[in-house]
Amino acid sequence: MEIDDCVIDMIQVFSKINREVPEKAKKAIVEIERLDILAKKEMEVAKKHKIEFFANYEEMTAEQKTKAFTFMQKKMAKVSEYSDQKIEIASGLKVLLKDVYGKFMEEEQKFIENLNKIPKAPETPPSSSPSVRSHRKKKLSEGDDDAPSSVDEKKRGRKKKPESEKAVAAAEPPKMYCWCQLDKNDTMIECENPGCKYGWFHFTCIGMITAPAGDWYCTNECRAQGLAAVAEAPQKAPQRKGLKKKK
């Protein structure tokens, strides 16, 4: 299995966890709370009859005593039944979480094993030749706008954004990149596929030490899409956005 396949499998496991586990856990908790309420009501009824039973014990006939005692037994049996149902639901949820955790650990192990098989790319000195793509690093400051694309906008000579657009952009939540969806201090590399869902990836998340000399794609699927886009519009070959230091 290739590294791309392992990554795709891990993403699918993450998606399944985010899609199924919270919903099933929520339903289980709601059902347990419902059973708690029912058990509490039965306990209150049993307690009330118990008090009345002992208060009127001397005046009650043998038949009344038997009926009262049988009634309290039924109520306590119902409470026990609700408790068993709660335990069963909690046990099922525990099994679900254990299975999901085991599946994730299995995919993680496959990813690590395949990652160790990848040969380390040798460091190459940056080239000033226009025919060779170079990877540029950029350290972002707190005042940068549209972090990943700001360098390209300057190189393509785009006009500075109006203040109104900057205000709107500042009000929007920052876009999260990489499979981890975390904002952390790490060097990032961009997938050459313009339609890539994540765009930028942390070196530590993909096991990269040095940037490759040529184009880089996060998965084979992105590679196919990116090359297809270049083939359809060869006059608009994508320009390398390079690397950046994420803080």
From Swiss-Prot:
GO molecular function term, any single one: zinc ion binding
Tissue-specificity statement: Expressed widely, including in the two ASE neurons.
Coiled-coil residue spans: none
Secretion signal, residue range per the UniProt entry: none
ZnF start-end (PHD-type): 175-224
Xref: InterPro entries: ING_fam, Znf_FYVE_PHD, Znf_PHD, Znf_RING/FYVE/PHD
Family annotation (SUPFAM superfamilies): FYVE/PHD zinc finger (SSF57903)
Location in the cell: Nucleus
Function description: Required to initiate and then maintain lateralized gene expression in the ASE sensory neurons. Involved in determining cell fate in the ASE neurons.
Protein name: ING family member lsy-13
Originating species: Caenorhabditis elegans
Lineage summary: Eukaryota, Metazoa, Ecdysozoa, Nematoda, Chromadorea
